Amino acid sequence: MKFGIVARRDKEEALKLAYRVYDFLKVSGYDVVVDKDTYEHFPYFNERDVIPLEEFDVDFIIAIGGDGTILRIEHMTKKDIPILSVNMGTLGFLTEVEPSDTFFALSRLIEGEYYIDERIKVRTYINGENRVPDALNEVAILTGIPGKIIHLKYYVDGGLADEVRADGLVVSTPTGSTGYAMSAGGPFVDPRLDVILVVPLLPLPKTSVPMVIPGSSRVDITLVSDREIILAIDGQYYEYLPPDVEITVVKSPRKTKFVRFTKEIYPKYTMKIKERH
């Protein structure tokens, strides 16, 4: 069994816990590699075990951080590697265990007392080309000029679904329904469902409403306004795009895999939503 370790880089407690996990696994006789960025912020790991995250080829990744750490892993790894996530963030919608339970969780993982929770992702094509990361949470099309709305049309499976004047449009997975989409007025969607959400950001008039569509759907977005936009993926990747761009969002063939110790969704998600608000 081979493990990879990735930690939140701006939090010393996360880096120290990552080292303790690394030491525990090495002493236990397992092969362990460490993310290069983690090492650069805490250079106490054996340098021979340090490789770029993009080159991880392991059985499990131990992620010590918040949702942002998980999103970084998902954007950079080339394989769908199961992630055991330790919460060193704020709310931690995606994380599984608290820091105090880290070594108990590792023991259960080693003993095979877990299951794999698979989550859908969405893939973005820009003028027919896929050159940006898949999104675990959402793809957001945003106004390139703060205070100026954008005018766009979006189509679902070839049919015009809506013409929107708004600050932008969010195309979200069920996992992302508790993030940007919810802030824009979208619903909570059980992450086990195979659906896609389309949520306008502050539309004018407010007749443009959020939609939940089948996960097999294709969403095509074109701009009516002659204005540059920003494409944002999971709040991690940003790119300015010209007004004549055509954007397509579909379900990705890849999935995110989480190590879980319980199949319970509720009340975890509902409690975290209340904490957030």
Curated annotation (Swiss-Prot):
Its cofactor is a divalent metal cation. InterPro entries: ATP-NAD_kinase_N, ATP-NAD_kinase_PpnK-typ_C, NAD/diacylglycerol_kinase_sf, NADK. One of its GO terms (biological process) is NAD metabolic process. One of its GO terms (cellular component) is cytoplasm. Pfam families: NAD_kinase, NAD_kinase_C. Its EC number is 2.7.1.23. One of its GO terms (molecular function) is ATP binding. Keywords: ATP-binding, Cytoplasm, Kinase, NAD, NADP, Nucleotide-binding, Transferase. It is found in: Cytoplasm. Transmembrane segments: none annotated. The active site is at residue 67. Involved in the regulation of the intracellular balance of NAD and NADP, and is a key enzyme in the biosynthesis of NADP. Catalyzes specifically the phosphorylation on 2'-hydroxyl of the adenosine moiety of NAD to yield NADP. NCBIfam families: PRK03708.1. This is NAD kinase. The lineage of its organism: Archaea, Methanobacteriati, Methanobacteriota, Thermococci, Thermococcales. The gene is nadK.
